[in-house]
């Protein structure tokens, strides 16, 4: 078993699927992001590590803490929401043939 002592944050993951926005609260995460967001980018750099097999995908939006129950995707942007990031990459990390955590972020 792998121990993640720095994974002490709760985040809310949002994913647009068709016309719906799925929401999932993930506990026991490592989440660090830059406060600065430029108007040209509308994006902030971050890294998220979530122990477990729940999939994270590029394009998912990650909110620091427990986020709103419902959001309007086109208005729920990192430029307007402190603590919100959008994943540019996401990848599973495996150990002994099993997914032990997912890493997502933007560099």
Model segments located where?
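N-terminal disorder-to-order initiation segments that are Gly/Lys/Arg-biased
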Residues: 1-49, 79-82, 86-107
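Short, acidic/charged, Gly/Pro-enriched secondary-structure junctions
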Residues: 53-88
């Amino acid at each position: 078993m792998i121990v993640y002592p720095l994974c002490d944050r709760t985040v809310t993951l949002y994913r647009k699927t068709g016309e719906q926005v799925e929401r999932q609260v993930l506990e026991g995460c490592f989440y660090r992001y830059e406060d600065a967001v430029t108007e040209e980018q509308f994006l902030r750099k971050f890294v998220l590590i979530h122990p477990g097999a729940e999939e994270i995908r590029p394009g998912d939006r990650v909110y620091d803490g427990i986020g709103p129950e419902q959001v309007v995707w086109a208005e729920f942007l990192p430029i307007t929401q402190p603590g919100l990031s959008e994943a540019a990459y996401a990848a599973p990390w495996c150990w002994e043939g099993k997914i032990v955590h997912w890493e997502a972020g933007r560099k």
